[in-house]
Amino acid sequence: MNITLITVGKLKEKYLKDAVNEYAKRLQKYCKLNIIELQDEKTPEKASLKEEKLIKEKEGEKILSSIKDNSYVVSMDLKGKMFSSEEFSAFIDDLGVRGNSSIDFVIGGSLGLSDAVLARANYKLCFSKMTFPHQLFRVMLLEQVYRAFRISRGEPYHK
């Protein structure tokens, strides 16, 4: 299975880079992981709603150009469906059974995802009603993908 993580913004803190690298290393056994970091657009301190929409649209264009035609796209969205770890594992397994060999997980910028990206998404996923820093969320998502593979194979890790 090919898993691509498409994110807006770059990791800055070393400890987060180390965590991402650790989960990327662990995931090598289960999938081919590709991480695409897209440049975020600068958001003025007091941006108007119109400016925010334009920024999301620009970031959305970058995201859409990074998605392959045959990819199953899962966007991170506060209005998406929440899963337990077991349900998330079953979701990924089911995608594989249905012949989806490429899954793109999309994490938007600080303003979220554009309407065009949300429209392209095959599935909208929500981890929590809380808001997380985008850099930290990247680690959380990779950990849950790793956990999902371990659960589906009945390997020790998940308790």
UniProtKB/Swiss-Prot annotation:
Gene3D superfamilies given in the database record: 3.40.1280.10
Q: Which reaction does it catalyse?
A: pseudouridine(1915) in 23S rRNA + S-adenosyl-L-methionine = N(3)-methylpseudouridine(1915) in 23S rRNA + S-adenosyl-L-homocysteine + H(+)
- Which E.C. number(s) belong to this protein? 2.1.1.177
Task: From the Swiss-Prot or TrEMBL record, state where the protein is found.
Answer: Cytoplasm
Kindly indicate whether the keyword Transferase belongs to this entry: yes
Q: Which residues bind S-adenosyl-L-methionine?
A: G108, F127, S128, K129, M130, T131, F132
Its top-level enzyme class, in one word, is transferase
Give the Pfam families listed for this entry: SPOUT_MTase (PF02590)
- Listed GO cellular component terms? cytoplasm
The GO terms describing molecular function are: rRNA (pseudouridine-N3-)-methyltransferase activity
Q: Which UniProt keywords apply?
A: Cytoplasm, Methyltransferase, rRNA processing, S-adenosyl-L-methionine, Transferase
Primary localisation category: cytoplasm
Q: What family does the entry list? A: Belongs to the RNA methyltransferase RlmH family.
Q: Entry's NCBIfam families?
A: PRK00103.1-3, tRNA_RlmH_YbeA
What is the recorded function of this protein according to its Swiss-Prot or TrEMBL entry? Specifically methylates the pseudouridine at position 1915 (m3Psi1915) in 23S rRNA.
Q: What assembly does the database describe for this protein?
A: Homodimer.
HAMAP family (UniProt xref): 23SrRNA_methyltr_H
Protein name, per record: Ribosomal RNA large subunit methyltransferase H
Q: What lineage, starting at the top, does this entry show?
A: Bacteria, Bacillati, Bacillota, Clostridia, Eubacteriales
